[in-house]
A protein has these predicted regions:
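C-terminal segments that line or cap access tunnels to active or ligand-binding sites in enzymes
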Residues: 221-330
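Residues forming anionic-ligand binding surfaces in small-molecule and nucleic-acid pockets
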Residues: 104-115, 272-274, 282-283
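Rossmann-like flavin
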Residues: 2-103
Length: 358
């Protein structure tokens, strides 16, 4: 199949666009400039600061209208690029935060410029190394950490959270509670005796949730040195697949995949002569009628076959270990509402000030 090497800077990207569709070079340069303007408003003046007041967001509305932020990401990209596969490649950013490019506001096209501005980094040792470093930092400052405990509910007195109830029956009193739990789950399951404000109840009733994720982790007894750290494998269908995931909520015979090969950057992720991967497949969340106990292994086999036909030849014979997670695991392990991979979807009416407040 065709390939597109995204590159690490605009010059590399332009070179690839020129190879595939020379007529789209000028359009891409306009897209990049528009993405920068969206970044200056959508990130610098909106996302990078707290939303304590609706007026703060309201002040940016005229500029957002001038930038045509009412368009979807797909409409934004299609206005600049004509080649269908380039349109697909440059409209996938909303999927990085759980959104459908055909529904998500083009504000999120700022991600393209953001990646060039800040870069894309990987911590040696992976996310686990970041967690270990944070644990060490907190312990050095006298913070007591409790591992393997699950908070079942918050204890509220006079409108304030004053403690937490654990699943093992213990109670911990607190002067202040900071929670990074999935907000919809917290409001619906961890405040059993609290009547929520009307606005919060309305948000919950009308909330649209992000897609689910099927994540397959596997190791191989050989290396695939030609495979980069990040690879996206696009299926034959695009809009139809996304419609099945986000609206029809059914599994499609086609799949699009994100393949992560950390050993391309950090060889400690696998023994010598071996490789380590995970592959992420967008799927419907648990609002769908899907039995993941039955469908999980089928999808795993489909993904392995797809990778074997494309970027990892001979994969079926080289896998030495593997396991997968489904939206059901996200619900059970991470208390994510409907097993959504990214909580509520990044629609305009659920972004910035419209999100759940602190």
């Amino acid at each position: 199949g065709e390939h597109f090497d995204y590159g690490g800077n605009p010059e590399d990207t332009v070179s690839e666009i020129r190879r595939i569709s020379p007529d789209d070079v000028a359009g891409y340069q306009r897209l990049l400039e528009h993405s920068k303007r969206l970044f200056d408003i959508g990130f610098t003046k909106l996302s990078a600061r707290p939303f304590d007041s609706f007026l703060l967001m309201l002040k940016q509305v005229p500029t957002l209208l001038r930038l045509k932020a009412y368009r979807t990401v797909w409409q934004f990209v299609s206005a600049h690029l004509k080649h269908d596969k380039l349109r697909r490649a440059f409209s996938i950013q909303p999927l990085l935060v759980g959104g459908n490019p055909f529904d998500t506001t083009s504000i999120y096209s700022l991600i393209h410029f953001l990646e060039y501005s800040f870069g894309v980094f990987f911590a040696k040792g992976g996310t686990g190394a970041i967690v270990d470093a944070l644990v060490g930092l907190m312990e050095r400052h006298g913070v007591r950490l409790m591992m393997g405990q699950t908070v079942s509910s918050l204890h509220i007195e006079n409108g304030a959270a004053v403690g937490v109830h654990l699943e093992d029956g213990n109670y911990i009193k607190a002067d202040m509670i900071v929670s990074n739990a999935d907000a919809p789950y917290l409001f619906t399951s961890m405040l059993p005796d609290v009547k929520l404000p009307l606005m919060t109840r309305a948000k919950l009733a009308q909330a649209h949730y992000s897609m689910g994720l099927f994540v397959l982790y596997f190791g191989t007894k050989r290396t695939y040195d030609e495979v980069a750290h990040h690879t996206i494998i696009m299926g034959e269908s695009y809009q139809e697949l996304l419609t099945d995931i986000f609206h029809r909520k059914v599994l499609n015979d086609d799949v699009s995949l994100y393949l992560h090969r950390p050993t391309a950057t950090d060889t400690s992720f696998a023994p010598p002569g071996c490789d380590s991967f995970y592959v992420l497949c967008p799927v419907p969340n648990l609002k769908a009628d899907i039995d993941w106990q039955q469908e999980g292994e089928k999808l795993q086999n489909q993904i392995i076959a797809t990778l074997g036909r494309t970027v990892l030849p001979g994969l079926e014979e080289t896998i030495v270990s593997n396991f997968f997670m489904t939206p059901a695991d996200f619900k059970d392990d991470y208390r994510s509402m409907f097993g959504a991979g990214f909580s509520i979807a990044p629609l305009f009416r659920q972004s910035a000030w419209f999100r759940f407040h602190n």
